[in-house]
Amino acid sequence: MNASTARMLNKICTYLFLTLLSIVIIYPLLITASSAFRVGNSAAFQLDFSGSWTLDHFKRLFDETLYLNWYSNTLVIALSVMVLQVTIVTLAGYSYSRYRFAGRKKSLIFFLIIQMVPTMAALTAFYVLAMLIGALDQYWFLTAIYIGGGIPMNTWLMKGYFDTVPREIDEAARIDGAGHLRIFASIVLPLVKPMLAVQALWAFMAPFGDYLLTKFLLRSPERLTIAVGLQSFISNPQQQKVALFAAGAILAALPICVLFFFLQKNFVSGLTAGGTKG
């Protein structure tokens, strides 16, 4: 087999894989859109774009359910987790990357050990703790768990990314009279924008997709998040509200999509700045 034939086969396999992957991703989206916009109440998810389309399911979502409460609850939690977690892991990652202090290596290893414990293994402990301190049905407790759960691995990731920024940049800035805060905020931080964008997106997405924690810790129907609220539409096999579920799922994806497109420029600018400074 010559080189040109090998390249052609490689290209065919690549396109075939990407086509199959696209089908796997797009097909469920089409089913969801079909169920959300099709007239009538379907008893099951179906890919059927025939007939009339309507926005009534979206209207019913806000008029007949607590979806607006769930939506606002999730946004508040997601924004809080994103801001606080990104701030904490950025400062922690920078500290581990640039400074040497007592217990540095041991604490990094401890972070890895904590990360090995699955969330499901701690559900009972979270519930008991919430009962003891009166934190059941409280957003601050749920937010704290999300933040704490994301700190160990994300601190490692941020440290690794800070390590890629040459220390010569810090030394040059220090010679010019820059202090620690200025070096961090004005010089190093712009170079790690790609990882900051990834961290922000991950932290923001977590409350939208989590079901177990909110199911355990939130009790009042009006204080639920989107994941638990939407599940209630299809939890009863005798009265499944597939159309409402699909409409709610589409709206739930919008904030994540908006944030992704908003952060895209940070990927590009951060990578460009890194190439220029390095």
From Swiss-Prot:
GO biological process, one term: maltodextrin transmembrane transport
Transmembrane regions listed in the UniProt entry: 12-32, 74-94, 108-128, 131-151, 183-203, 242-262
Keyword Cell membrane belongs to the record: yes
Broad class of where this protein is predominantly found: membrane
Keywords: Cell membrane, Membrane, Polysaccharide transport, Sugar transport, Transmembrane, Transmembrane helix, Transport
Lipid bilayer topology: Multi-pass membrane protein
Gene Ontology MF terms in the entry: ABC-type maltose transporter activity
A Pfam entry, by short name: BPD_transp_1
Keyword RNA-binding: no
Disulfide-linked positions: none
GO cellular component terms attached to this protein's record: plasma membrane
Subcellular locations according to the entry: Cell membrane
Residues covered by the ABC transmembrane type-1 domain: 71-263
Gene3D superfamilies registered for this protein in UniProt: MetI-like
Family: Belongs to the binding-protein-dependent transport system permease family. MalFG subfamily.
Subunit structure comment from the entry: The complex is composed of two ATP-binding proteins (MsmX), two transmembrane proteins (MdxF and MdxG) and a solute-binding protein (MdxE).
Task performed by this protein: Part of the ABC transporter complex involved in maltodextrin import. Probably responsible for the translocation of the substrate across the membrane.
Name the UniProt record assigns to this protein: Maltodextrin transport system permease protein MdxG
Organism (species): Bacillus subtilis (strain 168)
